[in-house]
């Protein structure tokens, strides 16, 4: 009874059954994940399946080992979205450098970057996604050990003036 009254009152005042709230707590996928889901460990290959190309799968991005569900913004992270290049991979390096033109930047490999600056940037992005009202943490990506040379330094200015 009280829930029905609350929904009707909300609709009367805000034209929304949730008092205008549109975050993850009214997303059926998030509720299902909270009730029945569990954090998953992904390989890089498994994570690549969640790039938005299959509309039946969620869209995941990785940031230095942490994986987030960003399906709520399919128009941003989906195949035709402006940030589609982040989907289905751990692109920690691109989050740090801001260099989106070089495909080698879309990796978790932070070698060659200033470690203090890189960790601060990574923490900032992880905090953003952890605290988001529409995205949520779903697991971790377990990477193979890094081999070979690190990516070439990007000549892109991180924050142009």
Where are these regions (language model features)?
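Histidine-anchored, small-residue-rich loop motif
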Residues: 1-161
């Amino acid at each position: 009874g009280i829930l029905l009254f609350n929904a009707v009152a909300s609709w009367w005042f805000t034209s929304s059954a949730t008092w205008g709230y549109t975050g993850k707590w009214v997303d059926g996928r998030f509720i299902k994940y909270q009730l029945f889901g569990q954090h998953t460990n992904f390989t890089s290959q498994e994570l690549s399946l969640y790039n938005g190309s299959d509309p039946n799968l969620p869209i995941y991005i990785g940031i230095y080992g942490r994986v987030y569900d960003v399906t709520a913004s399919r128009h941003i992270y989906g195949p035709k979205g402006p940030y589609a290049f982040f989907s289905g991979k751990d692109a920690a390096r691109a989050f740090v450098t801001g260099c989106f033109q070089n495909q080698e930047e879309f990796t978790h490999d932070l070698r060659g970057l200033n470690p203090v600056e890189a960790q601060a940037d990574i923490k900032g992005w992880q905090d953003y996604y952890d605290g988001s009202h529409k995205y949520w943490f779903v697991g971790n990506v377990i990477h193979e050990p890094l081999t070979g040379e690190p990516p070439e330094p990007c000549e892109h200015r991180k924050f142009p003036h």
